[in-house]
């Protein structure tokens, strides 16, 4: 039986688009919310808008540009992407998932929606502390207390690696759509991306692993 309604935190990338299709399978009614936070690859706003329109779901865009005023990172500033052993990559935006989920919860309550779907993933979390299961569960409790509302934060990708996320898209019948239409690349290139940035490397490695495993079955 499908649950009633859900709000998907949506960027138009591989993970959130897979979550959108997951939500459309499991819920009667789905809305999406995208955040404009001064990201360098602003194309993601247009991609998210386009995908939401194609799938016939209501799409909200919230202005979170203040993030760019108080943080310095490779996603909102014109600095080179760096990954150092033992350190959080400089693509990490302090407070992003915390703020996004909190504002998504405010919107969800106004829309009379209890379930919030997010594509955060601990398996491939790249050292990002706000992608951990313990963080999401803690925030879920905090939001319920803060707004006296029974939210449920759904994380369908939490324990999946990138190959398994591709598998889920395939199981949902959306493999080609996700492969061709989504934008994961830090340099704003849709589909296969630039093949150079960390996001593209992770996406491509997962794709190759899944296709290899699928070929053996």
Swiss-Prot record:
Its EC number is 6.3.4.20. Coiled coil: none annotated. SUPFAM superfamilies: Adenine nucleotide alpha hydrolases-like (SSF52402). CDD domains: QueC-like (cd01995). Its cofactor is Zn(2+). One of its GO terms (biological process) is queuosine biosynthetic process. This is 7-cyano-7-deazaguanine synthase. It comes from Streptococcus mutans serotype c (strain ATCC 700610 / UA159). The lineage of its organism: Bacteria, Bacillati, Bacillota, Bacilli, Lactobacillales.
């Amino acid at each position: 039986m499908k649950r009633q309604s859900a709000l998907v935190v949506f960027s138009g990338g591989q993970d959130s688009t897979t979550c959108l299709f997951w939500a459309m399978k499991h819920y009667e009614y789905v809305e999406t919310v995208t955040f404009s936070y001064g990201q360098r690859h602003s194309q993601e706003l247009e991609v998210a808008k386009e995908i939401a329109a194609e799938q016939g779901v209501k799409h909200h865009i919230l202005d979170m540009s203040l993030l760019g005023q108080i943080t310095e990172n490779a996603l909102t500033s014109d600095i080179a992407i760096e990954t150092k052993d033992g350190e959080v990559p400089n693509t990490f935006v302090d407070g992003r998932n915390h703020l996004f989920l909190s504002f998504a919860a405010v919107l969800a309550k106004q829309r009379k929606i209890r379930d919030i779907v997010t594509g955060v993933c601990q398996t491939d979390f790249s050292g990002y502390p706000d992608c951990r299961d313990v963080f999401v569960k803690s925030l879920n409790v905090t939001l319920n207390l803060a707004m006296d509302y029974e939210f449920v934060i759904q994380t369908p990708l939490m324990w999946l690696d990138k190959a398994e996320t591709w598998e889920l898209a395939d199981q949902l019948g959306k493999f080609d759509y996700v492969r061709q239409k989504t934008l994961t690349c830090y340099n704003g290139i849709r589909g296969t991306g630039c093949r150079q940035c960390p996001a593209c490397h992770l996406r491509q490695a997962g794709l190759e692993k899944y296709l290899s495993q699928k070929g053996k079955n």
